Amino acid sequence: MRFITLTSVFMLAISLMACTSGPPIHTVDSVNIERFMGDWYVIASIPTFIEKDAYNAIESYRLAEDGTVETTFSFNKGSFEGPRKVYRPRGFITDKQSNAVWGMQFFWPFKAEYRIIYLTEDYSQTVIGRTKRDYVWIMARTPVIPEDDYDRILDFLKEVGYDLSKLRKIPQQEK
């Protein structure tokens, strides 16, 4: 019974995440989807409820034959030694011209808005945002980024309307 209740709450939260409001948030002009695939370390985020207390968070993408994006989101809960949590949503690229707008599906039929709003030319850093500006993920190909880069991304997020007081740096163990 507890599982059904938790699943229902999670599905409701995801369905609410699918709703968008607020002024448009612009995406990058174009994403080379093959280059975007692979592992991304979550450097900081305005977390969803499942990500609170995440350590060593990594989002991995793989382009499936059907054009969807197989996603694995994993992290340690509560500490570096905490239990490893793994989620496997599927991404649906909804803007085929830019590849910068996706619907991320944790449970059918709900898809959460997923917009690539920042991407460095070398594909080493990215920011995923939402029109509601309720969640955001700063990600990189490495577990840490230079402080100047992080500050530049924070300036960008403030410019596009995010409340930086909600942002949480994700502890990452350097390998």
Regions found by a protein language model. Give the residues of each.
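Bacterial N-terminal signal peptides
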Residues: 7-15
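A beta-rich soluble binding module of mature secreted/lumenal proteins
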Residues: 19-175
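Positively charged n-region of N-terminal signal peptides that target proteins for export
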Residues: 1-5
